[in-house]
């Protein structure tokens, strides 16, 4: 039996307006090599000046994961030669990072929990981007110098499931703090996975393999499963020592395998030394006091939802997993609808209609509109069934709820006189069924309700229909 040992390095692009050491903008999708200056191009004589906002966001993150925030930290040079690094080194923090010794709790479906230790979170400058076009490689340096917070876990995870839970929790914390957009497709939340295996009960750490830059939670989970299978097969075949080497691998989603990219360097290979162009970084007491006051985090919001809205932990976790979802729900609650109905119509009905690029952030039906639709169910204006048709219409048309109801002709009839006339007609047309019902065949009651709803084209108030039929059928 083998045990899987996994540690993660997550590179979070911080959402500052300018780069880490210069005033170039960090915005995405600009023309190649236009967001650059002598500093981020590493031209001779250009000196770095630290962006203070990066420190502020680091304090917020350190507070969120209950970490030690070092009031004094230092920058170091990490030397390597890649085309996307014009300076031939990266400014990072090896010896004294800004954040150390944090922790993050992950929650399993069975209600159990596990704490994953965070070794450190350090500030570093991002590299540019290599663009491979057939036999030609191009370099875009717009991203060079963008501020990153690299969050390094301890090797505490034992399965792909734990990794996914950790990453989703970390992702939501970044979004709740609003220190980064954490967009995996745009590369602002990049994950390197370090995987090894060992015999169960063995405390030794065996050869670890790094899998780099996987851009979705699903692909990360699959890459881990494939790499663990590769290492386990090598161990069982007796080829572990020769086949499993310390290296960097890529996940090939088409061929469903991890494949070798390059040998993995040791720290000594990077020739770290203190950054000579930057002084020590000092966090003042005033900065600590101001930026350690952070917004409500996912776990806190979940606990509040359970208490305030009388829902179970699972429902609360669904609503708070993404800050956009939590904000949407709370906006619905401000309109005075029931929490139970808001939960159902948000998580089941609305989300069930999202396709392609549509999501909670750009939904054509905003929280106020969905809340009004729920209100129209609660006040008897329309039935729940009719409301689904209204929601379909609202997803395609930019109109208000009441206009949609009128256009579709779905307003519920609660006039007891009109409903009674329909009930009389249905009873008169189904005398044989009336006799059977009155002889004890109670299940036929649903037949009469269905016929009345059919005759009213779904517009009759179901409760009124039930009351009238019960009185008439006995």
UniProtKB/Swiss-Prot annotation:
Disulfide bonds: none annotated. InterPro entries: Asn/Gln-tRNA_amidoTrfase_suB/E, Asn/Gln-tRNA_Trfase_suB/E_cat, Asn/Gln_amidotransferase, Asn/Gln_tRNA_amidoTrase-B-like, GatB, GatB_C_1, GatB_Yqey_C_2, Gln-tRNA_amidoTrfase_suB_CS. It comes from the Bacteria. Signal peptide: none annotated. The keyword DNA repair does not apply. One of its GO terms (biological process) is glutaminyl-tRNAGln biosynthesis via transamidation. Pfam families: GatB_N (PF02934), GatB_Yqey (PF02637). Its EC number is 6.3.5.-. It is an enzyme of class 6 (ligase). Allows the formation of correctly charged Asn-tRNA(Asn) or Gln-tRNA(Gln) through the transamidation of misacylated Asp-tRNA(Asn) or Glu-tRNA(Gln) in organisms which lack either or both of asparaginyl-tRNA or glutaminyl-tRNA synthetases. The reaction takes place in the presence of glutamine and ATP through an activated phospho-Asp-tRNA(Asn) or phospho-Glu-tRNA(Gln). Heterotrimer of A, B and C subunits. This is Aspartyl/glutamyl-tRNA(Asn/Gln) amidotransferase subunit B. It comes from Sulfurimonas denitrificans (strain ATCC 33889 / DSM 1251) (Thiomicrospira denitrificans (strain ATCC 33889 / DSM 1251)). The gene is gatB.
């Amino acid at each position: 039996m083998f045990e899987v040992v996994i540690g993660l390095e997550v590179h979070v692009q911080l959402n500052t307006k300018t780069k880490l050491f210069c005033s170039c903008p960090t915005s995405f999708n600009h023309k190649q090599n236009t967001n650059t200056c002598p500093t981020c191009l590493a031209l001779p004589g250009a000196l770095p000046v630290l962006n203070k906002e990066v420190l502020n966001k680091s304090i917020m993150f350190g507070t969120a994961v209950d970490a030690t925030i070092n009031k004094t930290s230092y920058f170091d040079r990490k030397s390597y030669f890649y085309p996307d690094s014009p300076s031939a080194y990266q400014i990072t923090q090896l010896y004294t990072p800004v954040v150390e010794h944090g922790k993050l709790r992950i929650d399993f479906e069975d209600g159990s929990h596990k704490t994953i230790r965070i070794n450190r979170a350090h500030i570093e400058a991002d590299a540019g981007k290599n663009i491979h076009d057939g036999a030609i490689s191009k370099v875009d340096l717009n991203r060079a110098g963008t501020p990153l917070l690299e969050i390094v876990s301890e090797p505490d995870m034992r399965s792909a499931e734990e990794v996914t839970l950790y990453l989703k929790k970390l992702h939501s914390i970044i979004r709740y703090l609003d220190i980064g957009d954490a967009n995996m497709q745009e590369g602002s939340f990049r994950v390197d996975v370090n995987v090894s295996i060992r015999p169960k009960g063995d405390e030794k750490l065996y050869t670890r393999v790094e899998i780099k830059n996987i851009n979705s939670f699903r692909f990360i989970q699959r890459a881990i499963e494939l790499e663990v299978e590769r290492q386990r097969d090598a161990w069982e075949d007796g080829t572990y020592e020769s086949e499993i080497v310390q290296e960097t691998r890529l996940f090939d989603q088409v061929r469903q395998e991890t494949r070798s990219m390059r040998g993995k360097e040791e720290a000594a290979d990077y020739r770290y030394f203190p950054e000579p162009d930057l002084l020590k970084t000092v966090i003042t007491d005033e900065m600590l006091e101001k930026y350690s006051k952070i917004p409500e985090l996912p776990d806190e919001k979940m606990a509040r939802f359970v208490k305030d809205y009388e829902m179970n932990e699972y429902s609360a976790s669904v609503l708070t997993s993404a800050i956009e979802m939590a904000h949407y729900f709370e906006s619905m609650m401000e309109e005075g609808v029931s929490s139970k109905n808001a939960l159902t119509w948000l998580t089941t009905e609305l989300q069930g209609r999202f396709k392609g690029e549509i999501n909670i952030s750009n939904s054509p039906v905003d929280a106020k509109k969905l809340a009004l639709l729920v209100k129209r169910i609660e006040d008897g204006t329309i039935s729940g069934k009719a409301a689904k048709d209204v929601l379909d219409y609202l997803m395609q048309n930019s109109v208000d709820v009441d206009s949609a109801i009128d256009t579709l002709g779905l307003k519920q009839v609660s006039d007891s006189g009109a409903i009674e006339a329909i009930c009389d007609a249905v009873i008169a047309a189904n005398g044989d069924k009336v006799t059977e019902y009155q002889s004890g065949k109670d299940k036929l009651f649903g037949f009469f309700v269905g016929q009345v709803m059919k005759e009213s084209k779904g517009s009759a108030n179901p409760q009124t229909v039930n009351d009238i039929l019960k009185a008439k059928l006995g």
